């Protein structure tokens, strides 16, 4: 969802006074729910009966945009009541970055010619923390499992080397608590104490807020990588 944010901003700029209902997975909704144009959010159930019920209960829209090309989203689109419906076609937009693919999709749908701007995520108002030292975030998780994951000892080595210049925050989802704990143990062995291990203990909005305050972020190919690119 993060890589669709420039395209979403072009939709916002196209429709005067637009109000947006965001529909999607729990993670995508958590990331987008603080958008200033959001008036409603709906987390989708994967069951087709639930998709049908959701579509029928949402009411009418002037336009419906789907940035997914799965059969489920086509099913949802069919039953959504909207004057205009647009669906991303992954077979049409190829050989370019995902951000540009989504932006080209919106350009074609609205017959406009815009270039994608910076990724954008909106946060709730957060209290300003007093930061004593620059912050380094490390995120050992990666999309598609261990094949794209760097070793815990390598993360720990880098974090240890940089700990004199940065305070360290370890990030990770519930499924990455073990690897985060391995990194924490290695940091303790190296005498590093200026760290926090937040793996498995952040909501999506919390994660976005923490990442927005980092000075340096080291991660594999992951969702938090795309979040960091927005700041």
Roles of regions detected by a PLM:
Residues 1-231:
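Catalytic machinery of carbohydrate-active enzymes
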